[in-house]
Amino acid sequence: MVLENGFPPYPDFLKIFNSHEDSQLLVIPRSYNRYYPNPLPQTAVLKNPEGRFWNVQWTKSQEVIISLQEGWVKFVKDNGLIDRDFLLFTYDGSRSFWVRIHRNGLPLEPTAPIKIQEISDDEDETNGDGDPHMEEEGDTDENMIVSLSLGSSDEVGDDDDDDYDTAICDEVNKASGSSKKGRVTRKHRDDSLASITPQIFLADPNNPFFISTSSCSRRILVIARQVIKDYGLNFDGTVNLIDGFGELTRKVGKWKDRVVIYKWNEMFTRNKVKQGDVIICEIIREEDVVRSIKVHFVKN
């Protein structure tokens, strides 16, 4: 059977990028050796969701350690990989890998080109005479989150808080790395994730999924644009969250081109989620609409 991305259902493998170990070459988990063709092709192809591809040299040591070498440095540079990026590899059974990059619990999105606007001296003087807070307020307005108008008006306050959580989610993740305790937590999480095959946790290995972490806001679950694009996801006003305790119906909202699911914190509480735990979200659709998300918690 072929998945929606065009690849047969070989299990994915996950690598946590470490600039000290993975900048020049990438060692592939030994447990994955069983899936490679024999003899091993000289080159492999890495593809990203935007359609770009990189040719890399496939090497095999005397200790039967398989790695990606020549060409890997360019892949690292072109994608701007940094420490603790999650690299999720989907193999086609021949010589190609579809690579998805996650950062701070969200898929890494393409960098938009910078637009430069020329401003005349007159405009500078005009802005200088105006309210010094005007520009700051404009930036805030551009980054405001627009939620779906669902439910009664007495729920608006909660949703506003959730929207704020969405906006600061990435910053919270970055800030959590400032302490020694935070670095140790991430190290434990990275070590535990290095050997994870996400499909073994899924109810149906053919279902699409995405990976979240417990380091983001506990009030909302964010589904990034790239996940929505990769799997062609469509949502109604609500979705069912399923775990080992049962099912919760939650409201769905929109933030720009992302989707957020509100009141996510109850899943954390009843599953006793701790900092550094990894969350695999399995998407279940009915008639091309996401009806449920089955949540699998991988303890650190």
Curated annotation (Swiss-Prot):
Organismal lineage: Eukaryota, Viridiplantae, Streptophyta, Embryophyta, Tracheophyta
Top-level taxon of the source organism: Eukaryota
DNA-binding region: 11-105
InterPro entries: B3_DNA-bd, DNA-bd_pseudobarrel_sf, Plant_B3_domain
CDD domains assigned to the protein according to its UniProt record, in alphabetical order: B3_DNA (cd10017)
Region (Disordered): 115-142
Compositional bias (Acidic residues): 119-129
Annotated GO CC locations: nucleus
Compartment(s) of residence: Nucleus
Annotated GO MF terms: DNA binding
Name listed for the protein in its UniProt record: B3 domain-containing protein At5g57720
The entry's keywords: DNA-binding, Nucleus, Transcription, Transcription regulation
SUPFAM superfamilies noted in UniProt: DNA-binding pseudobarrel domain
